[in-house]
Each structure stands twice: as structure tokens, then as C-alpha cells.
Amino acid sequence: MHLSPQEKDKLLVVTAALLAERRLQRGLKLNHPEAVAFLSLQILEGARDGTTVAELMQVGSTWLSRHQVMDGVAELVSEVQMEATFPDGTKLVTLHQPIR
């Protein structure tokens, strides 16, 4: 299997996000890298499902709450940006203050 550097980066994000999902299921609070990976995967999967950029930006603040992350993580994650492939091309999705 031959992967481009961008594909390798996305695969790393997916791996970290799956670990974060498992930790959430066990009731553990996410740290900064886990929270960012989790949110990034939601963007990637939403784009793959055909959700629009505007819809992802609107719903993005509902994916994680303050009680699901370690103290201070919500303040550290002021913005998450992910380049995702939509049915009509690749677009940059930005979530502002995604953990509320």
C-alpha cells in the first residue's frame, strides 16, 4: 500500500481519534491531542457522509463538552481546522470554540 504524506497524516488522526472514542466510552476525560483528533475525525466522517461545511461548523460545538475533557483543554482548543474531502472537492473546515 502506497500512501501520500497527507494520507498518512489523516491515518494518524484516525488512529488517535479511535483511541479517544474508546477512552470516552470508558468514562475517561480526553487530553488536548485526543480531543483535537476526536473533533478532526468527526469532520472527516461528516464530509464523507455528505454533510456541508456550514452544517459541520454549526454542529461541531456539540460533539464534545467540558465535562468530557481534562481541566483546561476546552480553553486550549479554541479552534480546530481540518481539510476534508467532500463530494464536490476538498475544503477546509474550521470549528471555533468547539468544546463548550
Swiss-Prot record:
<keyword id="KW-0378">Hydrolase</keyword>
<keyword id="KW-0963">Cytoplasm</keyword>
<dbReference type="InterPro" id="IPR050069">
    <property type="entry name" value="Urease_subunit"/>
</dbReference>
<dbReference type="InterPro" id="IPR002026">
    <property type="entry name" value="Urease_gamma/gamma-beta_su"/>
</dbReference>
<dbReference type="InterPro" id="IPR036463">
    <property type="entry name" value="Urease_gamma_sf"/>
</dbReference>
<dbReference type="GO" id="GO:0016151">
    <property type="term" value="F:nickel cation binding"/>
</dbReference>
<comment type="subunit">
    <text>Heterotrimer of UreA (gamma), UreB (beta) and UreC (alpha) subunits. Three heterotrimers associate to form the active enzyme.</text>
</comment>
<dbReference type="Pfam" id="PF00547">
    <property type="entry name" value="Urease_gamma"/>
</dbReference>
<dbReference type="GO" id="GO:0005737">
    <property type="term" value="C:cytoplasm"/>
</dbReference>
<dbReference type="GO" id="GO:0009039">
    <property type="term" value="F:urease activity"/>
</dbReference>
<comment type="pathway">
    <text>Nitrogen metabolism; urea degradation; CO(2) and NH(3) from urea (urease route): step 1/1.</text>
</comment>
<comment type="similarity">
    <text>Belongs to the urease gamma subunit family.</text>
</comment>
<dbReference type="InterPro" id="IPR012010">
    <property type="entry name" value="Urease_gamma"/>
</dbReference>
<dbReference type="GO" id="GO:0043419">
    <property type="term" value="P:urea catabolic process"/>
</dbReference>
<protein>
    <recommendedName>
        <fullName>Urease subunit gamma</fullName>
        <ecNumber>3.5.1.5</ecNumber>
    </recommendedName>
</protein>
